């Protein structure tokens, strides 16, 4: 049995599997990183970083919601991210041209908003996005695609899975 998800659910699976000595692999409570090495072509990497972080509006366990970059490249990466994020097509997730759709429901929208507020309150640098609905999408649960620059790995937004379109750059 393989499971990726919350620690609470993983404990239940572990308890049930241990009763019958089943083999299992559990990845619990992690937050998937994308690592951008300094010998990479940054401009070519940016679309893949966005695809990893914002695919399914970030509502996936495998979303690459942490971007680890060499410290001396942060400013260059910031600019490339800003240039690219403004090209994202937000809209109907059934459309082939849409790159970012809404959250699944109001509860998830509110959860993502609370994480964004936490990032702001804890001092992460808000590069773009932030609280509220994406411009032009007052109906539905469209979160602004958000990027934080984080100089502290202990922030809640760095440590916990958000399941929304929020990218943390470290």
Where are these regions (language model features)?
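Periplasmic-binding protein-like
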Residues: 1-4
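Short, surface-exposed loop/turn microsegments at beta-strand edges and helix-strand junctions
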Residues: 161-162
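Glycine-rich nucleotide-phosphate-binding loops and adjacent flexible coil segments
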Residues: 165
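Short, solvent-exposed loop/beta-turn-alpha elements that line the ligand-binding surface or hinge
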Residues: 158
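ALDH superfamily catalytic-core signature
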Residues: 6-152
